[in-house]
Design a protein with these regions (language model features):
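Glycine-rich phosphate/pyrophosphate-binding beta-alpha loops
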Residues: 143, 251-276
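Conserved small/polar residues in nucleotide/adenosyl-binding loops
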Residues: 360-369, 380
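Predominant activation on well-ordered alpha-helical scaffold segments within soluble catalytic domains
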Residues: 23, 52, 75-78, 102-105, ...
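ATP/NTP phosphate-donor binding region
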Residues: 1-88, 335
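Carboxylate- and glycine-rich phosphate/diphosphate-binding segment that chelates Mg2+/Mn2+
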Residues: 151-258
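Glycine/threonine-rich beta-strand-loop-alpha-helix active-site module
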Residues: 72-79, 83-177
Length: 380
């Protein structure tokens, strides 16, 4: 697959070994002293060493980032950023590393706490937009799509809630999509992150918000997942499959400008309380949410089925594909296989009901006292 540059929604350099152009990216953004932000899992690979080898000067690395990052992770990163007088961030990793890196560049000179910039109304206008430092993103997973997003998700450890922090300038200025960086990803994380990409594209397509641009991107993203995720899972060295999955991941993040839904609003509280992998919980909830919403989404599911070339363009056949895909990826069938979902059922139901992405879930407010949410969370 040839190297190519895209300019939507930001500058994207796509292709094998494009990590070697990191110094050029820094120069284009006038970053002279970048802080590399990643997680400890990435440190166990040679990716950061390879990245530093491509820079004129060795960069300091901040890696105190949890798999479900917290506000404290951002605070510590901001401290490191300011103490060492950095002037930009290179965010490397999956969603945790990229979300944290973006937030560090955003928060470095803000005077308000991070929770004051939650994605509610015009709260983003509270920020000093002129003080946000430039960001370069290098994803090492194909799932979260944080590299093409204007938001980051963090757990507030005091309230055990996941919060979406948003600002238009949190969108990285340059994204390097190098499929070689996803080769070290183990099979289970390939599955989890790939299902996250599918959830983004699927929920975006099914959202009731009018956004035809995102609609088209979401549809093609679903097709790329169908044709490539199992290939990448079975053979992590399959560079073509890795390339297509990396593209679908970024496409999913672009698409969900149209909205998400109950898969994500259910996954957020589970991850906040039990620290589960976000993509895994999305994958577990997916068929239950689709079945629950069947009446309102069946026509769109038929359209998807036809586009991705399923043998029969029906809702039931699409569900069969989702279940088969989960089975091929060794995804647990029920939530009770990964958590004890009885202990915090009421709390999680309330959190899901009030999650900001639930507003595009077709039956979000249909049942009183969160009965619908309890029903989905209580699946055995």
């Amino acid at each position: 697959m040839e190297n190519i540059n895209w300019n939507y929604p930001t500058t994207i350099w796509f292709g094998v070994d494009r990590i070697k152009e990191i110094q050029k990216a820094c120069e284009e953004l006038n970053i002279q002293k970048p802080l590399i932000v990643t997680d400890n899992g990435i440190l166990k690979t040679n990716i950061i060493n390879k990245l530093n080898d491509c820079l004129d000067k060795q960069a300091i690395v901040f890696s105190d980032v949890k798999s479900n990052p917290t506000g404290k992770n951002v605070e510590d990163g901001v401290k490191a950023f300011n103490e060492n007088k950095h002037d930009g961030v290179i965010a490397v990793g999956g969603g945790s590393g990229m979300d944290t890196g973006k937030a560090i560049a955003f928060m470095a000179k803000q005077e308000r706490p991070i929770w004051d910039f939650e994605d509610i109304g015009d709260w983003w206008t509270r920020a000093n937009a002129d003080s946000i430092f430039p960001i370069i993103a290098l994803p090492t997973t194909a799932g979260t799509g944080s590299e093409t997003g204007r938001a980051s998700v963090f757990t507030n450890e005091k309230t055990q809630e996941k919060k979406i922090i948003f600002h238009p300038k949190m969108l990285p200025s340059i994204v390097i999509l190098d499929p070689n960086l996803t080769i070290p990803l183990p099979a289970n994380l390939t599955a989890f992150t790939g299902m996250d990409a599918l959830a983004h594209c699927l929920e975006a397509y099914l959202s009731n918000i009018f956004h035809p641009y995102s609609q088209g991107i979401a549809l093609e993203g679903i097709r790329l997942v169908k044709n490539n995720l199992v290939l990448a899972f079975n053979d992590g060295s399959n560079l073509e499959a890795r390339s297509h999955m990396l593209a679908s991941s970024s496409m999913g993040s672009i698409a969900f400008q149209k909205g998400l839904g109950a898969i994500h609003s259910l996954s957020h509280p589970v991850g906040a309380i039990y620290n589960t992998h976000h993509g895994l919980t999305n994958a577990v909830f997916m068929p239950y949410v689709l079945q629950y919403n069947k009446k309102g989404i069946e026509e769109k599911i038929v359209d998807i089925s036809r586009y991705i070339n399923l043998k029969s363009a029906t809702f039931n056949n699409f569900m069969d594909w989702i279940l088969e895909l989960r089975s091929n990826l060794n995804i647990p069938h029920t939530l009770s296989e990964i958590i004890d979902n009885d202990k915090n059922l009421e709390k999680m139901s309330s959190m899901a009901f009030n999650d900001p992405v639930s507003y595009t879930h077709l039956r979000a407010h249909e049942t009183p006292e969160h009965r619908g949410w309890r029903r989905l969370l209580g699946k055995k």
